[in-house]
């Protein structure tokens, strides 16, 4: 955390100099690119004709892409792999030939077999499926044009958000549609277990990686060299998900750095002049896996990927999932990001083929870039009216008068746009039409009955999932849609919560509380490391812009109009504050000296279910394994829980005094203090 002195620059800004804050932190209303519905043409042109069209994608610097077998040969014969094999042969006393054979086997398991025939088959099939389940697939054409130029100039890395299995299928479909090279995609080994489907994905550009490498130096060397070879040759755009896995809660997950490290290396070793990173935001009106995700969050194991499971999922073809919006962000030059920040000279001191241990500066740079890319994804995520509707309903459950819901939704629409949210309102229709249409799309969650909008939380008492009630499933499903709003609202909302938790109005005290909350919830939301002060300033600016607060030299004052805004924002984040309080109470009640993560998750679920059954809590969000895991990570980071590794297993011990202090600080029983420390 920053020291308390870091706040001085902000506290010198008073109402007499608002222009500085406006220039630095205003979120100007963007002139959003025009979206094109690509399904419109698909509905009028034969799918077979589309699949068999003349496909001549633009290529990197006009070179002829090499064949998949050539990439494998290049990796197998690379200096880096030769060096690693020699080193491992000395360490393990295995012969070079045996290790070389192992490299060949790894490549056979890993490599894609990109073939035009498979791409055409997927284009034909996906066109039919997408037309059946989606009303629109909207793409920003300006983003596509920028991507077209980027692909011809430098190697390109596509970094899409990850909310559904549809994500990577959709991107390949779109790039084929626009005559761009279909990407090579980093996919989990899970898909290889699917008969025929795994091979079809391989022939459509997927290359497969193990979830964990387990310290396997040879596997890591082969995998990284394989990715770098494709990147250096400009063979095709390389695509992977920074989040590492699909977000079950619809919040952006904290980034994983492994693949980003790999794709940056050719630039730092001067093997390519530049590399373009392209953040892509994929937004869904309705997630295909919404029910499956909630089951997983409630502790039901994720079903194994299988062809049988895929065939059973055919029933979704009879459902309507609304629209998808895909926003291709501006290509970001790695060279520009590194300019004046990172020197490449250290890579000149040793031959390129010798692996180097990553420096602290490089790790910090990769971390910063990863978070910046995710923030760009968030900035361009499209919000649907349903996210507003469900956010209002969750603060007025179980039912709400239709006219009141329309009024409150319109109010929230204005606030969302003031905060810079990318909100798509269907064809500028009146709210009286949009709200019922949204409810109809999500009829499994809510319904309109006699001018009352009702969340389906009381439709049955039967136990559905391991003793969990149907209403838990419905409410967690609602939370996932509400969470889409939190990415935009997090900074002003944390200021609002800090104002509520702070006695008095002193700006410095509010900032200390904000900093404490930001640190506690660092695993829940995406914050640029070391950016606490600017996040606070942005939150304050947006609240000033919405006329909720006034900032003086020393104080933050709530306006008469601001009470409504702050009350809503506090309500939006109340589930997270309460969830962490409940988890602290569980940790204090834990009788075991140590426990594993699996034991913790099962015990927290049982503890919170009892509170809900007794009626002593109405916080259903704490049932989510996503919240439970993030809270445990926060507790470890804050010193509330100690994490140890014994025999390759992680165990946890509770620090009771620190846990008590955290619970009291979240419950406003203990002042946050100045400065709020990184460790409790």
Swiss-Prot record:
Catalyzed reaction equations: dihydroxyacetone phosphate + an acyl-CoA = a 1-acylglycerone 3-phosphate + CoA; dihydroxyacetone phosphate + hexadecanoyl-CoA = 1-hexadecanoylglycerone 3-phosphate + CoA
GO molecular function annotations of the record: glycerone-phosphate O-acyltransferase activity
Position of sequence motif HXXXXD motif: 162-167
Chief location category: membrane
Key words of the record: Acetylation, Acyltransferase, Cataract, Disease variant, Dwarfism, Membrane, Peroxisome, Phosphoprotein, Rhizomelic chondrodysplasia punctata, Transferase
SUPFAM superfamilies: Glycerol-3-phosphate (1)-acyltransferase
Domain description: The HXXXXD motif is essential for acyltransferase activity and may constitute the binding site for the phosphate moiety of the glycerol-3-phosphate.
The name this protein goes by in its record: Dihydroxyacetone phosphate acyltransferase
Origin species: Homo sapiens
Gene: GNPAT
